[in-house]
Amino acid sequence: MEHKRLLKVRRRQKARKPEFRRYCWNKKLRLRNKSWRRPRGLFNKLRKRYGGKWSGRIPVNVGFGSPKAVRGLHPSGYEEVLVYNPADLEKIDKERQAVRIASCVGMKKRLAIEDKAKELGIKVLNPSG
C-alpha cells in the first residue's frame, strides 16, 4: 500500500522537475542530449548563480530526488531484472520483480522466455508484438 502511494508521489515530483540542461547546451550539438555537468569555471555565472545565465534556470540541487523506497523501480512498481535465457526465470520473485528480455536475445529464445514467464506468472516488461 505504501509503495503505491510513493509511486504516485514520484510521478507527481517527476512532472514538476525541470529539465536540467548542461551549460552551453544550445551552442554545441554534442551537448544537446548529454546529462547535467556541474559548471566549474572560475568566472561561470551559472555556478555563481547571477547574471543572465542564471535567471530562469535551476541547477541540480538537493530536493529533486524521488522517495528512496521506490527509487529505481519501474513505473508499474516492479524491480526490473534483465533476462537472457529461460533458466534465468527460476531466480525471479514474481511479487517484487518483473522481467525485461535483453536486446541481444533472438526471436526463438525470446518466445521461449515469454512462454515460460506466462507459465510461472511473471510479468514481462517488453513482450514481442
UniProtKB/Swiss-Prot annotation:
Signal peptide as annotated in the record: none
PROSITE patterns with a match to the protein in the record: RIBOSOMAL_L32E
Keywords attached to this entry: Ribonucleoprotein, Ribosomal protein
SUPFAM superfamilies per record: Ribosomal protein L32e (SSF52042)
Domain of life: Archaea
Gene Ontology cellular component list: cytosolic large ribosomal subunit
GO terms, molecular function: structural constituent of ribosome
Gene Ontology terms: biological process: translation
UniProt-listed Pfam families: Ribosomal_L32e
Homology family: Belongs to the eukaryotic ribosomal protein eL32 family.
Protein name per the record: Large ribosomal subunit protein eL32
Native organism: Archaeoglobus fulgidus (strain ATCC 49558 / DSM 4304 / JCM 9628 / NBRC 100126 / VC-16)
